[in-house]
Amino acid sequence: MSIEIIISLGIYFIAMLLIGWYAFKKTTDINDYMLGGRGLGPFVTALSAGAADMSGWMLMGVPGAMFATGLSTLWLALGLTIGAYSNYLLLAPRLRAYTEAADDAITIPDFFDKRFQHSSSLLKIVSALIIMIFFTLYTSSGMVSGGRLFESAFGADYKLGLFLTTAVVVLYTLFGGFLAVSLTDFVQGAIMFAALVLVPIVAFTHVGGVAPTFHEIDAVNPHLLDIFKGASVISIISYLAWGLGYYGQPHIIVRFMAIKDIKDLKPARRIGMSWMIITVLGSVLTGLIGVAYAHKFGVAVKDPEMIFIIFSKILFHPLITGFLLSAILAAIMSSISSQLLVTASAVTEDLYRSFFRRKASDKELVMIGRLSVLVIAVIAVLLSLNPNSTILDLVGYAWAGFGSAFGPAILLSLYWKRMNEWGALAAMIVGAATVLIWITTGLAKSTGVYEIIPGFILSMIAGIIVSMITKRPAKASYRLFGVMEKLLKRKK
């Protein structure tokens, strides 16, 4: 690793730690630590939600898929873009209004508890446990990505990369809480944006423009330029269904709960979707132009997911290379920090305060939150020590698991007055169980149907049927629904 790359990465790591220190000085109570005091503006909300969402797949996974399979990968990008937009449009305003009306709910399990008027502690326990289990695995996957990045891009030891990435993320998350996570995600989102604009443009000019690029791709495999080639109706529907997962991702939708004002959601949506469309387009073009570049200049690409890293090393000065590689770290670290904090909030707010210390002071809760971040990080690191550990295979299904378990339950809670706690509990259990059964029985592979499709549909049906056959929600729950709708109309 050259000294220039070390300097670039050093500047990046120091900047993240300084932001954590700034947030630490601003954090005084549990609301600050978990939701930043509900003071996020539209720019920070939009970019932090995007950065928390995208992880390393944006700079490695999507370019790699485009390089290997061509334009058929666009169906996945389209599904995710539509899902993100509908999340801003359908879920964000009502969730922000409801959490404010519901005595400032600060976590998803806390929202469910207050939405249904503390009617069943089981609902809070189940939702908190789902978050803890899936996100601990999810976090370990991000840590593995960090270790592998150092190993493949810098020739460094896997464990060194793992520990370095984890140490920086844990420090700023542990001390700065939600504000640190959101501000670092904002900066990391900006870095990702710049990298995914710069790399494909420079690579494109090296290939020679539009005609030479298409000529080189056609020479490799003309089917790479056919969006329908190799994509059956089932696979297209499955790709598009990825968008359903957005409704149930706690680390993304918590940003909507933390925004300063409901009115800020509209500009946040415009900023967030502009960011996403440009970065997804840059990611797609990086992979596609990579095919042309590799063929024209005889570059050997053993692993398609390395194409962004290859471009970063070949086309740029080492100082810029360090900056571009820090964009991958930014994508990885932004997701790890968000997942760590959401998991810690489930431990602190939804288990510790709810069942052990109802009258705990803010100082005590912040301390428990910080300890939770540390403990969860240690567990995730232990799972990550072996990058080929089979337990990490489950992480790829977490998106479908969260989307199916929480998505229908949250949407029904926000739009249907008759929804009760037993319906929400049934939706969570059926959604999560369907995804697990679909995967473990081999139905996902044999049918080609992405597990979120049966999971989401059956979860929605279970939520409606169980709510209808069990007792109506308390009158206070109906009143709260009315307060939410009035607040929503007043703030629009």
From Swiss-Prot:
Disruption phenotype: Disruption of the gene eliminates the osmotically stimulated proline transport activity and practically abolishes the ability to use proline as an osmoprotectant.
Gene3D superfamilies named in the record: Sodium/glucose cotransporter
GO cellular component terms attached to this protein's record: plasma membrane
GO annotation (BP), single: proline transport
One MF term in the entry's GO annotations: L-proline transmembrane transporter activity
S-S bonds: none
Induction: Induced under high-osmolarity growth conditions. Has two osmoregulated and tightly spaced promoters. The first promoter is sigma A-dependent and the second promoter is controlled by the general stress transcription factor sigma B.
Protein name according to UniProt: Osmoregulated proline transporter OpuE
